[in-house]
Amino acid sequence: MLHAFAGGTDGANPNGGLVLNSNGTLFGTTYTGGNQSCQYFQDEIGCGTAFELRRPTKKGGAWAERQLHVFTDGSDGATPNGGLIRDANGALYGTGQGGANRGQGIVFRLEGKSGGRWEDITIYDFPSNDLNGSSPLAGLILDAKGNLWGTASSGGTDGGGTIFRLRPAGKSWSFTVLHDFTGAPDGSRPSASLIFDAAGNLYGTTQYSGSGQACGNYGCGTVFEVWP
C-alpha cells in the first residue's frame, strides 16, 4: 500500500485512475475530502482534491502525498470523479462533476509553477441551460494537437449526455458538442473515458439505454463509435 486516505483535509474516495510522470510521481484525484466548508455536500465532507504521490528516494521508504489543489465549490468546481491526464509540458487536466459558477461541472487544468506551487485554471464551465451537457463523470483524453475530448453524463438537447471537444485557441478554448445522446437506441449517461483508434475515431460506453429491454425503462447500456 502506498497511501491510505484519511478523509477530511487529506481527501477521500479516489474514484478515477492515476497518471505517471517520467520521475515516477503519481497524480490523481479524490471525489470528496479537502475543504470541509464546501457546500456541495450538506454533510460537509469536502469537494475533493487533486494530489501527487512522490516515489521514495530509498528502497522501502514511504511515498510522500501532497495536495496540488483543494476544490472549493467556487469557480474551480467540485467532486472530480475521473482521473487526470498529463500533456507534454507536464500540465494536468481533469473534470469536476459539479460546482463552478453555474453548478453544472467544469473542465480544469493544473499547471505547475515555481516553488512547487500548482495553479488551478477552469478552462470550461458547463452552462446552466444544460445544452452542452452537464455533470462530467469521466476523465479526458488528449490528442497530438492538444485537443481535449470527453463526455458529460447528462444534459444536451435530449438530456442523455454529450460527447465534446475542447480545442486550444490562444489563451482560451473552443468548445464543440460532437454528439447528443438521445436514450433509446443510442444510449444515455456516458460515464467512462473515451479512447481513440489510429484513424482518430472515438469509442466509448453509456451506462443506460440501448435496444435491450431486460433492464427495464433505463436500458442495459451501449458501446458506441463516433467519427469526429
Residue spans of the language-model regions?
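Extracellular beta-propeller repeat domains
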Residues: M1-P228
